[in-house]
Amino acid sequence: MKILSIQSAVAHGHVGNSAAVFPLQRIGVEVLPVNTVNFSNHTGYGAWRGSLITPEDVHDVILGIEERGVLPQIDVVLSGYQGGTGIGDVIVDAVRRVKAANPTAIYACDPVMGNAKSGCFVAPEIPVLLRDRVVPVADIITPNQFELGFLTGTEPLTLEATLDSVDLARAMGPATVLVTSVERPDREPGTVEMLAVDGAGAWIVQTPHLPFKANGSGDVTAALFSAHYRATGDAAVALERTASSVFDLIELTYQSGERELQLVQAQNVYAHPRMQFSATRVR
C-alpha cells in the first residue's frame, strides 16, 4: 500500500507527517510525505520557528511525484491540519490527479478545526473550506464530536444524535466516518469512545480515558484507521486495531512523563496491536 500524506512537519515532537509517517511504515505502508510547514515544533508550545511552505511549492512537489509516474500506485491520499485555503485547493487538486491515475484510490481527510474545550483554533475561513469544498470530495473523514457538529450544523451529544450527525456528514460525500473521542453523557465513567460508520453499519469502541492529551494523537489515529480500512474494507476491524494502537501509545507516553508522543518507543503497538478492545455494533 502507498499513501500520499499531505500534512505539516516538525523537527521536535510528533504532529502531522511527523506523527503519521512512522506508524504507517511500521504496519508496512509506503508513505510519500509532502510537508505543508517546516516548523521547529508544534504551535501548542506558543512559540516556534520555521516557515509555511507555499501552496505553489506543495503543488510543485506533487507534480514532481506525478512526473515520476507514481500516482497510479497511490492507494490513499491523507490530509490533516490545513493552514490556509490555498493548501486546501492543492489537496483537492492532488486528490483529483490521483483518482484520475488510480480510480480505486481513496481520500481520507482529518478535518482539523478545534475541539469542545478549546473551540475553533484554525483561521476563520478553514471550517467553511473544509465543509464546502474538501469534505465533499473525501471518502473517509475523521472528525471529533466538535468538528462533526460544525460540519453538519448539529450538536451530537448523545449516541443517537451522533449517529444522525454522521448520516448528515455521509450525505455530504464521504462514505466512511470515524468520530474520535466521543463523549456521551451515558457512557461508563472514566471512558472515552470512538465511533466508525460506513455503508455496512456502525460500531463503537470504548477505552479507558487517560488524563492526558498529547498533540499528534489525532494524526496517528487518522493515519492508522485510514490504512487499516483501506487494507481490510472492514470498519469494525479498522476501529479495533486503531483503538488498540492509539491507546497503548498514549498510555506509554503518559507513563513516561514526557510531553511529546513516545512514537518510536511505542512502535510495536502499531505492528502488533494487542486487540484488547472489541467494537460493539450499534446499528
Segment roles from a protein language model:
Residues 236-283:
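Charged C-terminal helix
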